[in-house]
Amino acid sequence: MVANSAYKFRIYPNDEQKILFAKTFGCVRMVYNHWLDRKIRQYEENKTNVIYTICAKEMAAMKKTEEYGFLKKVDSIALQQSLRHLDTAFQNFFKQPKTGFPRFKSKKRSKNSYSTVCINGNITISNGYLKLPKIGQVHLKQHRIIPEEYSLKSVTVSQTPSGKYYVCILYYDYHRMGIGGYLL
């Protein structure tokens, strides 16, 4: 069994990176809302759910159209993660209706954030900088040392209403778990 550890750090993007973050936040929100609308219509018509794999395939085709070509300019994994989050929200609603029906994300109400997964070293931390896909090297205020045996799993970038940017980095911690999955 693997334990996860998360660390939250402040990041200081330059003006160009702030624009890229804003585009990514907007595209993630647009993809989430587009597919939420599609899932609602499908469910109302024939009481079925559009599963993640179908959404991901259709989104890949959608990115090739001229109308949605702007989606190519942001991290594709972040877009896929928004579909996964939507799929999880739908599954949770059907398993436990008390969780509530998934809501549309708005510019005013929603928290600006996106998640991306580390694949083949596309996300790294070195010398006070965090390398993110399609964004590049972002200055990171690293106030904690991350143990060498940890393996980077995913990153969530968020922006507060005051305009500050933070990153929450999730790590696998293989050495923390002992025999039978119990902490040593």
Where are these regions (language model features)?
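Nucleic-acid substrate recognition interfaces
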Residues: 1-184
